[in-house]
UniProtKB/Swiss-Prot annotation:
One of its GO terms (cellular component) is photosystem I. Residues 2-31, 39-68 form the 4Fe-4S ferredoxin-type domain. The gene is psaC. Its cofactor is [4Fe-4S] cluster. It is found in: Plastid, Chloroplast thylakoid membrane. It catalyses: reduced [plastocyanin] + hnu + oxidized [2Fe-2S]-[ferredoxin] = oxidized [plastocyanin] + reduced [2Fe-2S]-[ferredoxin]. Its EC number is 1.97.1.12. This is Photosystem I iron-sulfur center.
């Protein structure tokens, strides 16, 4: 099941999220907006399993990567409010 993966401009290009992803959803692409001259990209969101390891690995105060689980997935995982 694919999940929505959003990359925000708080990305510092550290590659932590890319290394944390067990399904290789993320990759780094050239970007001049940060010191590292690269930013995370999510070209293979269909492979995202929703583990949120990328979110946990992100060192920025405001997460650069967010995985959005659909309502049905959230309920089935017992995460619904």
């Amino acid at each position: 099941m694919a999940h929505s993966v959003k990359i925000y401009d708080t990305c510092i290009g550290c590659t932590q999220c890319v290394r944390a992803c067990p399904t290789d959803v993320l990759e780094m692409i050239p970007w001049d907006g940060c010191k590292a001259n690269q930013i995370a990209s999510a070209p293979r969101t269909e492979d995202c399993v929703g583990c949120k390891r990328c979110e946990s690995a992100c060192p920025t105060d405001f997460l650069s990567v967010r995985v959005y689980l659909g309502a049905e997935t959230t309920r089935s995982m017992g995460l619904a409010y």
